[in-house]
Amino acid sequence: TVPAMEGTSKGFTDTFDYELYDSPAANDPADGFSFNYGNAPVGDQGQAEEGMAGRPGVTENISFEVDTWRNNDAEQGVNISGLVDGQDVGQLAFTNGVILEDGSRKTGSMEIRWDPSKGATFYSTGLTTNADFTDVDTGAFVGDDGYNFIISARVGGANQDLFIDNLIITAGKPTPA
C-alpha cells in the first residue's frame, strides 16, 4: 500500500519498472497483478489481476491489470476496470493476448495516469502483449485525496515472480508523456 496523497483527486501519474519471470517446464505463468487507486484500506491485499472486485468495504476503485494466467485464454491480457458505488464497471479497456510465456522473463516499464477530465491512460513496454490505452472514459469514478494506492499480485502455484522497482507516484493533473 502507498498511503493516500494530497492532490490525487485532481489526478495522478504513476511510473515503475517491472520484471516478470516464469520458470521453465512448470505450470503456466500465473496469475498476474494490478495497480489500484481507491478506497481500499491500507494493507488490503486486493484480488491481484482482478483488481479490488469483491474486497470487503471497497466501493470505489480504478484498476490497471495484467493477467498472465493461461496463455491464449480469452481473459488473459491487459486492461482497465474498476468499481463505482460498489458495482463492478466491467472492462473499460482490454487487449487480449499472451503476457508471459512459459520459461520466459519480461522486463520493462509501466506508465499509469488518471485525469478526472480525460480518464485513464495505461502504457506498458516489454510484455508480449502491451497496454496501450489513452484517455479511457472512467464513467462516474471520482477520485479522493483519501484514497490509497494498492499493488496487488498473486502467483498460482508459485509459478511466476514479480519485481517492481523505481515506483514514482505524482499527485495532480497529469501531463502527457
Protein language model features and the residues they cover:
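Polar, low-complexity loop segments and adjacent catalytic/binding residues used for recognizing
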Residues: 1-174
